UniProtKB/Swiss-Prot annotation:
NCBIfam families: IV_pilin_GFxxxE (TIGR02532), typeII_sec_gspG (TIGR01710). The lineage of its organism: Bacteria, Pseudomonadati, Pseudomonadota, Gammaproteobacteria, Pseudomonadales. The chain crosses the membrane at residues 9-29. Keywords: Cell inner membrane, Cell membrane, Membrane, Methylation, Protein transport, Transmembrane, Transmembrane helix, Transport. It comes from Pseudomonas aeruginosa (strain ATCC 15692 / DSM 22644 / CIP 104116 / JCM 14847 / LMG 12228 / 1C / PRS 101 / PAO1). This is Type II secretion system core protein G.
Length: 142
C-alpha cells in the first residue's frame, strides 16, 4: 500500500497571511469610511438637478416658477396663491418631495439671489453657510 503525501499550509504561513490582511484592512478601512460624506454630497447634487428639471417643466407649463411661498410643494400638488398656475400638470411634476441625504428639506427661493431660483441643501449641519461637509450645496454649484 502506498502512502499519499499531503501538503498544506503551516501555522506560520497562515499567521503571515492573517497579519498581511490585518495591515491591508488598517490601510483601507479609513479610506472607505471617509466616502459616505462624499456620497451624500453627490446624492444631494443629483437631487438638486432632478428638482431643478421639474421646476423648469413647471415653468414651461405655467410661464413662471412657483413663488417662494408656494415652495417646492407646488411640484407635488397644485398650488394656491399667486402666481396662479395656468396649465398645472394633473399628475404633478414630482411624485413626492425628496429630503436631502441628511434628512432635511431642500430650500427654495424664487426669485433667487444667484439665478431665477435658488435650490439648495443646508449640508450636514442643517444650517446656512458652513464649509466642507457642512457647506450649502445649491443649483449654482452644478
Amino acid at each position: 500500500m502506498q502512502r499519499r503525501q499531503q501538503s498544506g499550509f503551516t501555522l506560520i504561513e497562515i499567521m503571515v497571511v492573517v497579519v498581511i490582511l490585518g495591515i491591508l484592512a488598517a490601510l483601507v478601512v479609513p479610506q472607505v469610511m471617509s466616502r459616505p460624506d462624499q456620497a451624500k454630497v453627490t446624492v444631494a447634487k443629483g437631487d438638486i438637478k432632478a428638482i431643478a428639471a421639474a421646476l423648469d417643466m413647471y415653468k414651461l407649463d405655467n410661464f413662471a416658477y412657483p413663488s417662494t411661498q408656494q415652495g417646492l410643494e407646488a411640484l407635488v400638488k397644485k398650488p394656491t396663491g399667486n402666481p396662479q398656475p395656468k396649465n398645472w400638470n394633473k399628475d404633478g411634476y414630482l411624485k413626492k418631495l425628496p429630503v436631502d441625504p441628511w434628512g432635511n428639506p431642500y430650500q427654495y427661493l424664487a426669485p433667487g439671489t444667484k439665478g431665477p431660483f435658488d435650490l439648495y441643501s443646508l449640508g450636514a449641519d442643517g444650517k446656512e453657510g458652513g464649509s466642507d461637509n457642512d457647506a450649502d450645496i445649491g443649483n449654482w454649484d452644478n
